[in-house]
Amino acid sequence: MLHTLPHCASSVDFPALLRLLKEGDALLLLQDGVTVAIEGNRFLESLRDAPITVYALKEDIDARGLGGQISDSVVRVDYTDFVRLTVKYANQMAW
């Protein structure tokens, strides 16, 4: 399943998001959600043990001036990659 997070983590039920993550899922951070990808962010730390891949939309990272602060554990993607993720994951959950 592809989970998309367009909001800062404190604006959503993040514990519920963590509970619903399954092995092989992906989490795409976009819009204000890219703040989760900042190195040392407590929400990112809680994702480290999850059996998922965390992606962040590069355009949203750049728009917020966060390029140098993003954790190396987060995969940066562009809009083309975003489309590929939506094709790869038939099921999606928007938070």
Swiss-Prot record:
SUPFAM superfamilies (UniProt xref): DsrEFH-like (SSF75169)
One GO term of the biological process aspect: tRNA wobble position uridine thiolation
Alphabetical UniProt keywords: Cytoplasm, tRNA processing
Keyword Cytoplasm (UniProt): yes
GO cellular component terms, semicolon-separated: sulfurtransferase complex
InterPro entries for the chain: DsrEFH-like (IPR027396), Sulphur_relay_TusB (IPR023526), Sulphur_relay_TusB/DsrH (IPR007215)
Subcellular location per the Swiss-Prot or TrEMBL entry: Cytoplasm
UniProt family annotation: Belongs to the DsrH/TusB family.
Complexes and interactors: Heterohexamer, formed by a dimer of trimers. The hexameric TusBCD complex contains 2 copies each of TusB, TusC and TusD. The TusBCD complex interacts with TusE.
PANTHER family the record matches: PROTEIN TUSB (PTHR37526:SF1)
Known function: Part of a sulfur-relay system required for 2-thiolation of 5-methylaminomethyl-2-thiouridine (mnm(5)s(2)U) at tRNA wobble positions.
Annotated protein name in UniProt: Protein TusB
The encoding gene: tusB
